[in-house]
Regions:
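N-terminal segment of the mature soluble domain
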Residues: 12-13, 17-19, 29-101, 135, ...
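Soluble non-cytosolic domains of exported or imported proteins
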Residues: 29-41, 76, 80, 120-123, ...
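Short coil-to-beta-strand transition motifs
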Residues: 93, 184-187, 235-242
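Short hydrophobic alpha-helix segments
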Residues: 59, 144-146, 237, 244
């Protein structure tokens, strides 16, 4: 690894994903389904693909394999150039995900006058609450909800059958992508890195969830807001400076065009946020 690449890796904020928590309001059947699903893997993949964080595994099976390699490294059969004990990195924040609601199933109705024929439609939906926990202070750095769903069109089937796994996978991938995007926006806000006329270049690429035609509000960052009673930093006094629309999404940067606001008043360091819906 080159010096610059190593420096980039060291500088990345380290996170891990905690074991999934499922609300008691989720039925036993759906609880089993979501716990056995690929949701955690999808979340980890989405975070890693975003390139903003160094993702540390805390999954028991992966840690067991790492421990096995560490034991082998002490056997005298290896060059002892890796798998050192006591060198695993600590996460600066843990991502705690709680599934508040989850549904996956198939609706079916008989087709009149056709024996054994059913109109079927598959659907999957998930609602999660996410907390970003600081591992040093034990504080909640950020919290946000995530929702996603997927459904099939109606088709005619010979019998009711079972819902398509592809519909579930699609909903979980969407949820994971939404989570990773909001995580990045919380820890590392979308920031203008260059401005020329009405064009803005920001530090997000084609794996950030930004889409051509999507609209963002542009803010000018102000002074930090400090709670006089607790000393806590409550963020900055942001002032709305304009509105911009995505015109091109590149691998590592996205270009937007200002649709509202004065171009001369917007520059490097300004922050973009999605409109609150």
């Amino acid at each position: 690894m080159s010096g610059s690449a190593l420096a980039e890796a060291v500088a990345k904020y380290r996170v891990s994903v905690a074991d999934l928590t499922v609300s008691d309001s989720v039925s036993a059947k759906n609880r089993k389904c979501v716990l056995e699903s690929s949701l955690v893997s999808n979340i980890e993949n989405a975070i890693r693909n975003g390139r903003k964080f160094e993702l540390l595994t805390r999954r028991a099976d992966a840690l067991a394999e790492i421990r096995k390699e560490q034991e082998f490294a002490k056997s005298g059969l290896t060059a002892a150039d890796a798998a050192a004990e006591g060198q695993l990195s600590n996460a600066q924040s843990v991502i705690k995900v709680t599934v508040e609601s989850f549904n996956f199933g198939r609706s079916a109705s008989k087709v009149p006058n056709l024996e054994g024929k059913y109109k079927v439609s598959d659907n999957a939906s998930i609602s999660m609450s996410v907390q970003i926990l600081d591992t040093t202070k034990g504080t909640v750095v950020g919290a946000f909800p995530v929702k996603a769903s997927s459904s099939s069109g109606t088709s005619v089937s010979n019998g009711i059958g079972s819902p398509s796994r592809a519909i579930l996978d699609q909903a979980l991938e969407r949820a994971a992508g939404n989570l990773a995007n909001q995580l990045s926006d919380t820890i590392f806000p979308i920031t203008v890195i260059q401005a020329k006329g009405k064009r803005l270049w920001v530090n997000r690429g084609n794996d950030s969830g930004m889409k051509q035609g999507e609209t963002f509000i542009v803010y000018e960052p102000g002074e930090d807001l400090i709670d006089p009673q607790t000393g806590e930093n409550l963020g900055s006094a942001e002032m709305e400076a304009g509105v911009a629309k995505v015109v091109r999404v590149n691998p590592k940067v996205t270009i937007l065009e200002l649709t509202k606001g004065e171009p001369d008043s917007i520059g490097q360091g300004f922050i973009l946020r999605r409109p609150v819906k």
